Swiss-Prot record:
It holds the Pfam family DUF697. InterPro entries: DUF697, UPF0283. This is UPF0283 membrane protein YcjF. Residues 1-19 have a biased composition (Basic and acidic residues).
Amino acid sequence: MSEPLKPRIDFAEPLKEESTSTFKAQQTFSEVESRTFSPAAIDEYPEDEGTAEAAVDAALQPKRSLWRKMVLGGLALFGASVVGQGIQWTMNAWQTQDWAALGGCAAGALIIGAGVGSVITEWRRLWRLRQRAHERDEARELLHSHSVGKGRAYCEKLAQQAGIDQSHPALQRWYAAIHETQNDREIVGLYAHLVQPVLDAQARREVSRFAAESTLMIAVSPLALVDMAFIAWRNLRLINRIAALYGIELGYYSRLRLFRLVLLNIAFAGASELVREVGMDWMSQDLAARLSTRAAQGIGAGLLTARLGIKTMELCRPLPWFDDDKPRLGDFRRQLIGQLKETLQKNKPTPEK
């Protein structure tokens, strides 16, 4: 039996007419206005670009307090007093022909000179590390610029800092690909796709090797204290290796600053990135049911080392990452799991016949 028809529904309001797009009236500029016309500025940079790095730089800026100024002033006054007293002792020893005191003054002068030289060297290396962030900002500006004349000199400076020889095949391909009609954006883009991947590949191999060593060491070592010392030592060596690959020579204070910068960068990135890259795939494979507790701890330590290496690459790299060349933590995870399974299968005793 067919269903009864529904009653008619009357709407009180009339149907809305379709809105048609209206165009603005034509506007004619005079000759004087056309000369002074300037297009509206368009924000070429995304809002979130460089937010984490800016937050890290702000966190690392020392707070200028009164106590800090007093301590620096006291140290400067003490240094001037030591130099003045040393000059007076030297003059007195020379006038009285006290050769023992004169030798002591000479030894003290050598020690002070060595200390001042070390301070200058450390300051220069620390300045070089800070300069890398400015170079990355300059590269970001060139990649959004249509000017001509700065890109080639900038890329040649990067190649010289990284120790890339002029006869290197990648650099030769870059020279063959550029010409005078290209702007700075195209020249820097070609360098980023032809020359920079050579250094990135070496850094990736270092990160993969150190992460694998950390994974295997934690998986087979029964001592937690030894594990902690080993991981700390290997992570510091990884930071030194990556910085050297990108042409940055680290001193004591610059090494501490870079290590602190990496840790702060990881902290600002948060755990959401780790969950997004690894979490779902980790849970889908049910590793807790397949591997032992020590093996799972080894994979976790290896992933932390890999994450430390990725952030070090990001901070030491002179060019910003493109979407397709940034290393992913999931790539290292799959490699670590494969190497760990292979090692466990080799060490597994075969049943006797």
